[in-house]
Amino acid sequence: MSNRVIIFDTTLRDGEQALAASLTVKEKLQIALSLERLGVDVMEVGFPVSSPGDFKSVETIARTVKNSRVCALARALEKDIDAAAQSLSVADQFRIHTFISTSTIHVESKLKRSFDQVLEMAVGAVKYARRFTDDVEFSCEDAGRTPIDNLCRMVEEAIKAGAKTINIPDTVGYTVPSEFGGIIETLFNRVPNIDQAVISVHCHDDLGLSVANSITAVQQGARQIECTVNGIGERAGNCSLEEIAMILSTRKAALGLETGINAKEIHRTSSLVSQLCNMPVQANKAIVGANAFTHSSGIHQDGMLKSQNTYEIMTPESIGLPRNNLNMTSRSGRHVIKHRMEEMGYGEHDYDMDVLYESFLKLADKKGQVFDYDLEALTFMEAQAEEESFYQLKQLVVHSDSTQGNATATVKIELDGEVVTEAATGNGPVDAAYNAIARASKCEINITSYKLSAKGEGQDALGQVDIEASYQQQSFHGVGLATDVVEASVQALIHVMNLTWRADKVADCKQKIQQKARSLGGV
């Protein structure tokens, strides 16, 4: 048996079913091309009979993608199979994936037929699909709750009819790994023609077991895993592609299995899917979450500085993320502070570690995360636990034209005691407000990242704006929080401006100290 596991991605079919709004044809093509770069073997890109839009998406992707096999879904009905075949006909190679329910509750309650009738429909659908392609996949919907005798019979007959891939879905995420693995093992033991098809699994995450069930299945002989990027999909989602890929890669010695996934494309593909689908990735998500390679515990940080292998079983670079983070918080030890100071070019004799660390802990308790520019301020300036404010917003008035997209903003800002008023236009209210602030402050800041997130629920939820900005080759992070998005955005910018003002003061103070040291050295 081959040790190669086929990765069947269904982000654009099963994954899209979780979205509040459908993706456009252009957006689907963007994701499909990213999946092709990622190296998926098969991509299921739609359900053509469901709508003209889905048909067009499948056809467009089938015409464009060359290195992955394009697949479309069809019920065990001739009209569905016709639509799938027609939409895929422009592809060099394609797969038709047909399915029917096999569990007792589905057969009796949903289909209202006998199992023998359902079996006949399944066989007929596979034979009909084989008229269009040799690559036919058949799925036993709700296989996880199907009586094992019926499941074995269905699989055997579908293979006889010409199915080259048999998919065993845990449609409602009901089984546990030992149970699901037992189903796969039984199929291999009892279905006489099982060696004539690839056994596939499609596990849902209702009980959080989709990845575990899929790994157990390949240990029992399955050789295709159906999954989605970021695990998106119906209800609690699907088996996560990036988790499967990195499990099989990281634990290759133990599992003896491999995929054709280009892991360095994982981060980029995950970010694209998250952005286009408007589904943020939770921070603690395995592999691609913001915290996946972030270390905040002082003990962990100390270990990481000595050897990355102490607390990382894979590297961020392996998934295309070129860095890892040691967040400086109140839990960070002296070793981390010393390391960060060394990275910024400071030797042990440039500062007093006892004084710096005490000041650092006070600031960390107050603001949570401490940044490099905070450390410099603590090093060269006293009483920096309380952040000084050179810029203060006194008034903000915004007028927007929703039909044209233009806006005008008037701001009143206090600059070290002097109040300045300026107005400006912009492409939207935030842009207008930022332009007005730039006029008033004469402060040149380049915003490199803008992120808006909700804190709370409903109409009274607070909007948090996080911005990254560059100033004189340094990076600064500003935060704003308000019920009004424009106000939160302005708060974040003012925060950054005060940080840059403080950085200038630090630089001046640093220069004076260095000049004094040089003059003393010359005496």
Curated annotation (Swiss-Prot):
Gene Ontology biological-process annotations? L-leucine biosynthetic process
A cellular component term (GO) from this record?
cytosol
For the ligand (Mn(2+)), the binding residues are 14, 202, 204, 238
User: Which UniProt key words apply to this protein?
Assistant: Amino-acid biosynthesis, Branched-chain amino acid biosynthesis, Cytoplasm, Leucine biosynthesis, Manganese, Metal-binding, Transferase
Superkingdom field: Bacteria
Q: What is its EC number?
A: 2.3.3.13
Cite the Pyruvate carboxyltransferase domain residue spans from the record: 5-267
Catalytic activity, as annotated: 3-methyl-2-oxobutanoate + acetyl-CoA + H2O = (2S)-2-isopropylmalate + CoA + H(+)
Q: Per its UniProt record, what InterPro entries does this chain match?
A: 2-IPM_HCS-like (IPR050073), 2-isopropylmalate_synth_dimer (IPR013709), AIPM/Hcit_synth_CS (IPR002034), Aldolase_TIM (IPR013785), LeuA/HCS_post-cat (IPR054691), LeuA_allosteric_dom_sf (IPR036230), LeuA_bact_synth (IPR005671), PYR_CT (IPR000891)
| Entry GO MF terms | 2-isopropylmalate synthase activity; acetyl-CoA C-acetyltransferase activity; manganese ion binding
Q: Where is this region: Regulatory domain?
A: 392-523
Entry's Pfam families? HCS_D2, HMGL-like, LeuA_dimer
What is the annotated localization of this protein? Cytoplasm
Per its UniProt record, the required cofactor names are: Mn(2+)
**Enzyme class, first EC level, given as a word:** transferase
Biological or metabolic pathway of the protein? Amino-acid biosynthesis; L-leucine biosynthesis; L-leucine from 3-methyl-2-oxobutanoate: step 1/4
Q: Which family does it belong to?
A: Belongs to the alpha-IPM synthase/homocitrate synthase family. LeuA type 1 subfamily.
Q: What does this protein do?
A: Catalyzes the condensation of the acetyl group of acetyl-CoA with 3-methyl-2-oxobutanoate (2-ketoisovalerate) to form 3-carboxy-3-hydroxy-4-methylpentanoate (2-isopropylmalate).
Listed PANTHER family? 2-ISOPROPYLMALATE SYNTHASE 1, CHLOROPLASTIC-RELATED, HOMOCITRATE SYNTHASE-RELATED
Assembly: Homodimer.
Protein name, entry field: 2-isopropylmalate synthase
| Native organism | Shewanella woodyi (strain ATCC 51908 / MS32)
